[in-house]
Amino acid sequence: MNNSEQFLSPRMGRVEQIHFVGIGGAGMCGIAEVLHNQGYRITGSDLGESGTVQRLRSLGIQVYIGHRLENIKGADVVVRSSAVDFNNPEIVAARELMIPVIPRAAMLAELMRFRHGIAIAGTHGKTTTTSLVSSLLAEGGLDPSFVIGGKLNSCGANAQLGKSAYFVVEADESDASFLFLKPMMAVVTNIDADHMDTYEGDFEKLRTTFLEFLHHLPFYGLAVVCLEDEEICRILPAIQRPTLTYGFKEEAHYRAINWTQKGMLSEFVVVRPAPHKQLTIQFQYPGRHNVLNALASIAIATELGVDDDSIVRGLQKFQGVGRRFQMLGEKQFEKGAAIIVDDYGHHPQEILSTIDAFRRVWPERRLVHVFQPHRYTRTQSLHRQFVDVLSLSDELLLMDIYAAGETAIPGVTSENLANEIRSRDKRVTIVSEQSLKATLDEFIKDGDVILMQGAGSIGQMAVNLMKNM
């Protein structure tokens, strides 16, 4: 038995072949890759080709395009993405054949069961924080396994099978599936209104579900929570597990002081609990929110015994995560050249944090914001917040709402959103994928920065734009 095997779950009974429905999803492909590396035979299906599908195939994983009942042939268990409904032909066929159908989080929990699990939760910042924790543990020689909801730029993947007991995962609250997990350590970055249909529109239910998640820690586990978040402060007195806090406030256990932003470079000093000394941190990820994400990762790394030099070096070397304030390069348009930044942000708070980071990195440059709203329900429930934050852009190009499988809601449109923003004397232009390049040729001035933002198809549009569409 090699080192990578001794910390893994025992073989799952008679399970040899595992089929993933929606294997191209950010939360699915990483689990599939880890299981493939453990020796299971993996198959999967997805609606279309993608870079993720191509990567899985390059590893030797069979991926079918389209959902058909014959795709599950030979499967001992079927893993279902939360984006896949129960009427999917593969799900229906599996149930008829009495093949177990489980949610992705149940499989993630099984992978974690015999390991030292570190789960990163929160409405915003999960992917970056999970990536930072994984990077610092790797830099410290702990060789963790990880499953992240985005591509870690340093390795070009969102999952890795390490040789140690440590297993770092992004914990998803969108469908409350993080309650499947029983980690040894957990981070909660923040609690904000999103995916409220899961919580029946009840914010108190959302808040208490995060508390329940933290109570899945053992009594000797560790919760690491952000003291800057108002909702976390509300549940803090009720957390019945060992807890450390982080933030800018003086009472935080892990505290950032003297933060400065010079271009893309963030620099700050982190004050840690005794006997740990202060560290001067530099890393190429802008914005106040990313200082907080770094603090969470420093807390986890310190508590696991990663040495100071490795923490400092790991943050200096951090190359970021795909689609999180990712600079794609500079492109020449008809009236000038502009930098293109791709970002996954799709919630008003995420947009606000990104715009704040933009203003700190490029205080003299004009922000040309191309935004694709994601989901009708989110656009409807957070309409006022979207109007407020999108009004902060210098030029706003608004795309149609990306449905993400939802049925359209009457009256919930990008045009209605645009009209309310226009009532504030802001110019808004409705664009499509087909008209985007021509519109940018008309708008762009030399030195502008284009922010392509959203959780839908806009990420591929940004790549296509760099390739001259």
UniProtKB/Swiss-Prot annotation:
Q: Output the InterPro entries linked to this UniProt entry.
A: Mur-like_cat_sf (IPR036565), Mur_ligase_C (IPR004101), Mur_ligase_C_dom_sf (IPR036615), Mur_ligase_cen (IPR013221), Mur_ligase_N (IPR000713), MurCDEF_pg_biosynth (IPR050061), UDP-N-AcMur_Ala_ligase_MurC (IPR005758)
- For this protein, the Enzyme Commission number is 6.3.2.8
Which parts of the chain span the membrane according to its record?
none
- GO BP terms, alphabetized: cell division; cell wall organization; peptidoglycan biosynthetic process; regulation of cell shape
The protein's matches in SUPFAM superfamilies, at most eight in alphabetical order, are given as:
MurCD N-terminal domain (SSF51984), MurD-like peptide ligases, catalytic domain (SSF53623), MurD-like peptide ligases, peptide-binding domain (SSF53244)
Q: Where does this protein reside within or beyond the cell?
A: Cytoplasm
Binding locations of ATP: 122-128
Which pathway, metabolic or otherwise, does it act in? Cell wall biogenesis; peptidoglycan biosynthesis
Enzyme class, broadest EC rank: ligase
Q: Which UniProt keywords apply?
A: ATP-binding, Cell cycle, Cell division, Cell shape, Cell wall biogenesis/degradation, Cytoplasm, Ligase, Nucleotide-binding, Peptidoglycan synthesis
Gene Ontology terms for molecular function: ATP binding; UDP-N-acetylmuramate-L-alanine ligase activity
Reactions it catalyzes? UDP-N-acetyl-alpha-D-muramate + L-alanine + ATP = UDP-N-acetyl-alpha-D-muramoyl-L-alanine + ADP + phosphate + H(+)
Q: Looking at the keywords, is Heme present? A: no
Under Pfam families, the record lists: Mur_ligase, Mur_ligase_C, Mur_ligase_M
Q: Which Gene3D superfamilies match?
A: Mur ligase, C-terminal domain, Mur-like, catalytic domain, NAD(P)-binding Rossmann-like Domain
GO cellular component annotations of the record = cytoplasm
Q: Which family does it belong to?
A: Belongs to the MurCDEF family.
Q: What does this protein do?
A: Cell wall formation.
Q: What is this protein called?
A: UDP-N-acetylmuramate--L-alanine ligase
Q: Which organism is it from?
A: Legionella pneumophila (strain Corby)
